[in-house]
Amino acid sequence: MQYGYTLPVRGPLATADGVIGMARHGEKLGFTSVTAADHIVIPTKVESAYPYAADGRHPSQGDAMEVLSLLACVAGATEKLRLITSVLILPHRNPVLTAKMVATIDVLSKGRVTLGIGVGWMREEFEALNAPDFDQRGAVSDEYVAIFKKLWSPGPVEHQGVHYNFGPVRCEPLPVQRPHPPIWVGGHSKPALRRTARYADGWHPIGTVPTAELRPAEFAAMRDDLRRMAEGYGRDPFSISLAFVPRLHVSATPVDGADRMPFTGSAAQLIEDVETYRALGVTHLSFDFRGPTLTETLERMDWFAHEVMAKTRG
């Protein structure tokens, strides 16, 4: 099992000391990756429902570091950590510029980028960015992935599509990773599974939250759907990685009850949950250890590394 953790893009830890401190500490502890989320602006009036909160409200009030800039900084401050966008909202940015930025970070990090992608949920943010039509975001995202793969190939290349066009161009340097950095798709909807099956190298859903529990039986059913879809596209279904993002709730004593949410409870229960999802095919788990202070955050990382990660890495 490989383990990653969330870097702060907002709040009191979203500083140079906070981001770099967490990244370097995690690398020393043996974590394999860091993730960072993507928002550019938060309009003052948002009616769109955040899909991972029971009340539909997103926790940010507008503070959000730009994710690719943040990961470029972390690339220079670390040597081994994989750098994962979790997730990059594809329609928010020009696809040619995005391809160039991702390739540049991959070159400077010596091949450590994983591009986690999503289609977005906040209509108001799309409008503020003058992004493509929110209701076409799925089709736009699919086309942008195709553009990325072209631009990450030896040129010249061109693209004549529904949502974007360009004539013959070269876009170099190419990414270090060939044929391209791994692409993981976030989300657990049918369109997200289809997008993963057709285009991606990994499935990267959030789980163990009230609106997306993804308990073992549900996760297994979605995994099976994904693999059937992949076969339908002529792909090896087992070539698609399963990278789960559960919410973590640690307690000093075991949590009782049949309705206990996975990754809630004592160290022994967390270890059991790791093994359960490993048996389902999950090879990467990412957690959010952020606390009120950097000291408390690093202590949480220490605890998990010694009490759970060290006992489940094999």
Task: Kindly give the residue locations of the regions a language model identified.
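Active-site-adjacent structural elements that line small-molecule/cofactor binding pockets in enzymes
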Residues: M1-G314
